A protein has these predicted regions:
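Select transmembrane alpha-helical segments in multipass membrane proteins
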Residues: 26-27, 92-128, 172, 209-224, ...
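Helix-loop junctions at the membrane interface of multi-pass solute transporters
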Residues: 35, 117, 124-130, 134-155, ...
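Transmembrane-helix boundary/entry motifs in multi-pass membrane transporters
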Residues: 15-18, 163, 202-218, 243-256
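Hydrophobic alpha-helical transmembrane segments of multi-pass membrane proteins
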Residues: 1, 27-34, 50, 60, ...
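Membrane-interface loop-to-helix entry segments
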Residues: 8-13, 19-28, 32-81, 241-242, ...
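Hydrophobic transmembrane alpha-helices that form the core helical bundles
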Residues: 1-17, 197-202, 223-245, 262-272, ...
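Extracellular/periplasmic helix-exit of transmembrane alpha-helices
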Residues: 61-81, 85-102, 108-109, 141-153, ...
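Membrane-interface alpha-helices at helix entry/exit sites of multi-pass transporters
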Residues: 25, 145-168, 248-259
Length: 310
C-alpha cells in the first residue's frame, strides 16, 4: 500500500513541481519518520486533519471542471458503461466479425474484454476502498467507548462509517476522477496516462481549466491523500505485528519493531523511485492474500454480527 501511494505522490510532484522522484522519496521518508515516531495519537491526529482537507479540495476542483464540460457528460457516461463490459475497445472488431458471421470469435472477444475489465476494476477498486481486506477494522478500532454498552454502540457506529467510506471513495471520488479525465481528454486519455502517469494526467486535466493552479491543487491533494494513507498503512502493520509478537520477549519484540520501522521507511522511498507496473503486480497479489482469510472470517462471524441488532 505505501509503495503505490508514494509512487503516485512522486509522479504528481514530478509533473507539478518538477521535483525528481529521488528528491521526493527522501523528503517523504523523513516526514513519515517524524510522524511515525510520535506514536498512534500523532498518526491519528495527522490523518484526521489531512483527509477532510484533501477530499474537499479535490471534490471542489474536480466538480468545477466536470460541470464546465456538462455537454459531454452523457457521452462520457456511455464510454464508462461500454468500458465496464469490455465493449469500448472491441466495438469495431466485434462489428466486423459479425458482418463476416464469425459469431464465435466475436463472442470470445467480448467475453475476454469483460473479464479483463472486471479483473482490472476489482483489483483497482479493492486497492482504493479496501473493501473486504479487513484493514479498515484496525483503524476504526482506535475509537473506543466507555462501558460495555458504549463500546457496542461505538463499534456499530464505526461499522456504518466504514460502509460509507467505501461508497464515498468509489462512487463519488473514483467516479469524479473518471469523468474528469474523460471530459478533458476524450480522445487521447491513454496517451496522457502513458506519458504522465495517472496522477500526472489528473494534474494536466485540472491545469486545462485552472492553468498552473490546477497542477498545484493536484499536487497538494496527492501529498495530503498519499501521506495520510502511508501513515494509516503503517499503523495497520504495526498493530498486526504487535499481535503476532504478543508472546515474544520484550527485547526481541523491540528489535523486530525497529526492523519493521526501518523496512517501512525504505518501502516509502522505494515506492517513489520504482516502476509502478511492478508495484501494482505485487500489491494485487498481497491484496488477494489479505482478502481470502478476511472474507472467510466474515462468513463465519456473520451470525455474531447480526445478533446485537435483534
Amino acid at each position: 500500500g505505501c509503495m503505490l501511494e508514494a509512487g503516485a505522490l512522486a509522479n504528481s510532484q514530478r509533473y507539478a513541481a518538477s521535483l525528481p522522484p529521488l528528491g521526493t522519496g527522501i523528503i517523504l521518508a523523513v516526514l513519515t519518520a517524524v510522524v511515525l515516531f510520535g506514536g498512534a495519537k500523532r498518526i491519528g491526529w495527522t490523518a484526521s486533519v489531512l483527509v477532510p482537507v484533501s477530499a474537499g479540495l479535490y471534490l471542489l476542483a474536480g466538480g468545477i471542471v466536470v460541470f464546465s464540460f456538462y455537454d459531454q457528460i452523457p457521452e462520457v457516461l456511455g464510454k464508462i458503461v461500454g468500458g465496464a463490459f469490455g465493449l469500448a475497445d472491441n466495438a469495431g472488431q466485434t462489428a466486423g466479425s459479425s458482418i463476416l458471421n464469425f459469431s464465435g470469435i466475436s463472442g470470445g472477444m467480448t467475453g475476454y474484454g469483460m473479464a479483463a475489465a472486471i479483473r482490472s476494476g476489482v483489483s483497482r477498486g479493492v486497492f482504493s476502498n479496501e473493501a473486504g481486506l479487513g484493514s479498515l477494522a484496525v483503524l476504526h478500532g482506535m475509537s473506543e467507548g466507555k462501558g460495555r454498552l458504549r463500546q457496542r454502540q461505538e463499534a456499530q457506529k464505526q461499522g456504518m462509517w466504514a460502509i460509507f467510506e467505501v461508497f464515498f471513495d468509489t462512487i463519488i471520488g473514483c467516479s469524479l476522477t473518471a469523468f474528469l479525465l474523460l471530459c478533458v481528454f476524450p480522445h487521447n486519455l491513454t496517451e496522457k496516462i502513458d506519458s504522465l502517469g495517472g496522477s500526472g494526467a489528473v494534474a494536466a486535466a485540472l491545469a486545462a481549466r485552472f492553468g498552473n493552479a490546477g497542477g498545484i491543487v493536484t499536487a497538494a491533494c496527492m501529498v495530503l491523500f498519499a501521506f495520510a494513507t502511508i501513515l494509516a498503512w503503517f499503523y495497520i502493520g504495526d498493530q498486526a505485528l504487535g499481535w503476532l509478537m504478543r508472546d515474544v520477549p520484550q527485547k526481541r519484540a523491540d528489535k523486530i519493531c525497529i526492523l519493521y520501522h526501518g523496512g517501512y521507511l525504505a518501502s516509502v522511498f522505494l515506492g517513489c523511485v520504482s516502476r509502478m507496473e511492478a508495484v501494482w503486480a505485487v500489491s494485487d497479489i498481497f491484496n488477494g492474500l489479505m482478502a481470502v482469510p478476511n472474507l472467510a472470517a466474515l462468513v463465519l462471524l456473520g451470525r455474531k454480527v447480526r445478533r446485537p441488532e435483534r
